[in-house]
Amino acid sequence: MTNLKDHPWAAGNLVLTRAVLERVNEEARLAYGRDEESCGFLIGPSKDARRVDGVVPMVNRANALHRLDPESYPRTGRTYFDIDSMKFEREIRKGEREGRPVKILYHSHLDVGAYFSPTDAEVAKMGQGEPPWDLAYLVTSVRGGKVDDRKLFVWDESMRGFVESPFEVEESR
């Protein structure tokens, strides 16, 4: 169950700094060159729940897992991302303790557009009925090596699914 009182950013309508957006775009372009989705998380001050001002890239382990065991991991990093969930959970706890919570989990899509796929939804829910973390989710579209779109998604309790949420980009402060 989403706890919007303690984690209001999970409702979306966030404000990303221009520097954060540019870094996410750069990570997406670089990952495109490696033929894999970028992934990581975005953080911000707990005292300003809507503000997102930090980027923490993570390694997409999908290609490595596919090479090790293609039967268990049939998809490659081009259409899927896999992060170290234990490291991610540690970062969530650390962010809460230090007043710089994880607010957004981000990843890119290669040559297919910015949408929240059924796979994205299943990964976000981690096999449960709803996501275990109160986060928003940013998907960046990269086509031909160029970022052409991005969309923010949040969990909607009443719909029992993910819906698009608006977000703003802060030019300067």
Regions from the PLM with identified roles:
Residues 1-102, 113-173:
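Conserved beta-strand-loop surface patch within small alpha/beta domains used
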